From Swiss-Prot:
Chief place of localization: membrane
Organism of origin: Proteus mirabilis
Family named by the database record: Belongs to the FHIPEP (flagella/HR/invasion proteins export pore) family.
Protein name: Flagellar biosynthesis protein FlhA
NCBIfam families: FlhA (TIGR01398)
Its membrane topology: Multi-pass membrane protein
Localization terms from the record: Cell inner membrane
Length: 696
């Protein structure tokens, strides 16, 4: 007995168990069994009672649900309950036809009760009641709910693109985070699936009502044939017995069907609020005392008409008038009015104390636009700038190896109407102008002729440009100008600024998130690396040094392997950066020179190189004249390199690379300083020009 109890014991935590997985298959098996196997009357009583209880539960859940998606399983439940009722009809029909001649209890006590007590044992009344229930279910509730579900599905599908764009806009504006955006997108998808399912599920109920009417006719006709032909019953006795059993069977199935249809109507007609259906009805029906008073007045007039049931009308008149008077007094009582006035005065005179919520943290990256540029960042007005910026962030992450911060875009009345500002931590790092509806014609250096328009400079690279009207677009292209839209101008400028400040935008939080991301892919390599082998601060500084010189950090495996090899003996971030750069020599060479076998670089004179090495080893600085001369010669070499179509790269001794890079970075940010150890094998190096110090 104890073993049996232990076998039958259900798990305590149903949600974490696998018992729920069996619910669907068990129910399907039960339905098929009822259709195929003959059931005893007692089991039919249990199943009919279970069907009624299930329908009441579904209706109550629909009533207490606050949002439609809180009962997203309703279409599936509707299908299962419909199949359950039909299978019960099949099982009860079988037992009525087989055992109906034995008496009214042949199909169980539940069918007998519905056939006798609820309709007084009169099969004519039972047929009328049954037909009325079917008409209510089929013509009123089901038809209305089906139409609402159809229209709701159409509107939900039509509104999906707008909802998705609104979610993307909120995400790009920083109003919500990525997790909230995923949650909202999932809800939009679930809502669409729900109303689409409800549109089809409503057909189940309509078909169930039609099937119930046909089963009634089949049972009556079949019962007469079986009773008279097989059991030699009198026609009147057969008609009375089988009709009452059929009516009981029909009523015990149609009443749950009516309840389920009502639940479907409640689900599709409700509006999502913080209240359930009952609270909405009570709050909105009985909150206005004038409505109750007017209703009481109309009922009172009807109650005074001769021949009317005066007591009933006057009773409800008094009840509604009393309720209206009570609500009116409650709304207009001195205490309530005084409380409202006090709250209003307190609200006006309240001194709001400063709190930590008033401290506004600066966004890592943001953009402010003038009011004429607002349509460009508004998805509802077909603005495409948000999508372009999202694409730039994704491309940057793929190329440089980390995801930059979300760009918070806002309008600012202090910014000129057609201007914009790009800010990093609240400080402007770029600005420009854009004119929606016009085109920017950029002169790449080989354009011929002039164009009518507003002369300006392209904000990203400072090239001469002209804002032109759409009518001059083709002419500008023919003359050799590069013509771009206003949104492209801003997007290109933003991309340039993003790459320019890649190192400063890479903070400790980004370093931690990147390390966590790598840890998921390479758990053995990253195990015990931080903080046992090196600190997060050192890793952050090394990666920041790489980004400061436009070196991508995509190859984190190579970076971490180099750090793991040298970090135990070396803790200086600058020295570790040099080691990592050598390990990344293939990526660095590929980044600056592509697949070219011959690479053209700017060289450093051997004499100047020895002089710089001696100065570095002795700790002394360079003479001002020599430093100025090196800077000027580097500038001339970069110009010649760019005019010849080459990449501005200075190749120096490995020991001098870091020093010269820091020295030349401010005046020549476009110049990349590489060491001879950072060039991958198999590349032929050709010096196009030489920086020779004072003797050049």
């Amino acid at each position: 007995m104890a073993n049996l109890a232990s076998l039958l014991r259900l798990p305590g935590n149903w949600k974490s168990s696998q018992w729920q997985i069996l619910a669907g298959p068990v129910l399907i098996l039960l339905i098929l069994s009822m259709m195929v196997l003959p059931l005893p009357p007692f089991l039919l009583d249990l199943l009919f009672t279970f069907n009624i209880a299930l329908s009441i539960m579904v209706l109550l859940v629909a009533m207490f649900t606050r949002r439609t998606l809180d009962f997203a399983a309703f279409p599936t439940i509707l299908l299962f309950t419909t199949l359950l009722r039909l299978s019960l009809n099949v099982a009860s029909t079988r037992i009525i036809l087989m055992e109906g001649h034995t008496g009214s209890a042949a199909a169980g006590r539940v069918v007998e009760a519905f056939g006798h007590f609820l309709v007084g044992g009169n099969f004519a009344i039972g047929i009328v009641v049954f037909i009325i229930l079917i008409l209510i279910n089929f013509m009123v509730i089901t038809k209305g709910a089906g139409r609402i579900a159809e229209v709701g599905a159409r509107f939900v599908l039509d509104g999906m693109p707008g909802k998705q764009m609104a979610i993307d806009a909120d995400l790009n504006a920083g109003i919500i985070n990525e997790e909230e955006a995923k949650k909202r997108r999932k809800e939009v998808s679930l809502e669409s699936d729900f109303y689409g399912s409800m549109d089809g599920a409503s057909k189940f109920v309509r078909g169930d009502a039609i099937a119930g009417l046909m089963i009634l006719v089949i049972n009556v006709v079949g019962g007469l044939v079986v009773g008279v032909a097989q059991h030699n019953m009198a026609l009147n006795d057969a008609a009375s017995t089988y009709t009452l059993l059929t009516i009981g069977d029909g009523l015990v199935a149609q009443i749950p069907a009516l309840i389920i249809s009502t639940a479907a109507g409640v689900i599709v007609t409700r509006v999502a609020t913080d209240e359930d259906v009952g609270q909405q009805m009570v709050t909105q029906l009985f909150d206005n005392p004038r409505v109750l008073m007017l209703t009481a007045g109309v009922l009172g007039l009807l109650g005074l008409v001769p021949g009317m049931p005066n007591f009933v009308f006057l009773f409800f008149t008094a009840a509604l008038a009393g309720l209206g008077w009570y609500i009116l007094k409650r709304h207009s009582s001195p205490q309530v009015q005084q409380q409202k006035e006090l709250e209003q005065v307190e609200k006006q005179n309240r001194v709001v104390e400063a709190s930590w919520e008033d401290v506004q943290l600066e966004d890592p990256l943001s953009m402010e636009v003038g009011y004429r540029l607002i349509p460009m960042v508004d998805n509802r007005q077909n603005g495409e700038l948000l999508g372009r910026i999202s694409g730039i962030r994704k491309k940057f992450a793929q190329e440089m190896g980390y995801l930059p911060p979300v760009v918070h875009i806002r309008d600012n009345m202090e910014v000129k109407p057609s201007s914009y500002r790009i800010l990093m931590k609240g400080v402007e790092i770029g600005h420009g102008e854009a004119h929606p509806g016009r085109w920017l014609a950029i002169n790449p250096g080989n354009a011929v002729g002039t164009l009518e328009g507003d002369n300006t400079q392209e904000p990203a690279f400072g090239l001469p440009a002209v804002w032109i009207d759409d009518s001059l677009r083709e002419q500008a292209q023919v003359q050799g100008y590069t013509v771009v839209a206003a949104s492209t101008v801003i997007a290109t400028h933003f991309n340039h600024v993003l790459n320019q400040y890649a190192a400063e935008l890479f903070g400790r939080q980004e370093a931690q998130m990147l390390f966590d991301r790598v840890s998921k892919e390479l758990p053995k390599m990253t195990e015990n690396m931080i903080p046992d082998m090196l600190s997060l601060t050192v890793l952050h500084k090394v990666l920041q040094n790489l980004l400061a010189e436009q070196v991508p950090i995509r190859d984190m495996r190579t970076i971490l392997e180099a750090l793991a090899e040298h970090a135990p003996e070396q803790k200086d971030p600058a020295e570790l950066t040099a080691v990592v750069r050598v390990a990344l020599r293939r990526a660095i060479t590929q980044h600056w020179f592509g697949d070219k076998e011959e690479i053209q670089v700017i060289g450093l004179d051997a004499g100047l190189e020895r002089l710089l090495l001696q100065a570095m080893q002795s700790g002394g600085g360079l003479e001002p004249g020599l430093a100025e001369n090196i800077e000027q010669q580097a500038l001339d070499a970069v110009r010649r390199q760019e005019m010849s179509g080459g990449v501005p790269v200075l190749l120096v001794n490995h020991a001098l690379r870091s020093l010269l890079s820091r020295f030349l970075r401010r005046s020549l940010p476009q110049l990349a300083v590489l060491s001879n150890m950072e060039i991958s094998e198999g590349r032929h190096i050709r010096m196009t020009s030489m920086i020779g110090g004072q003797n050049n």
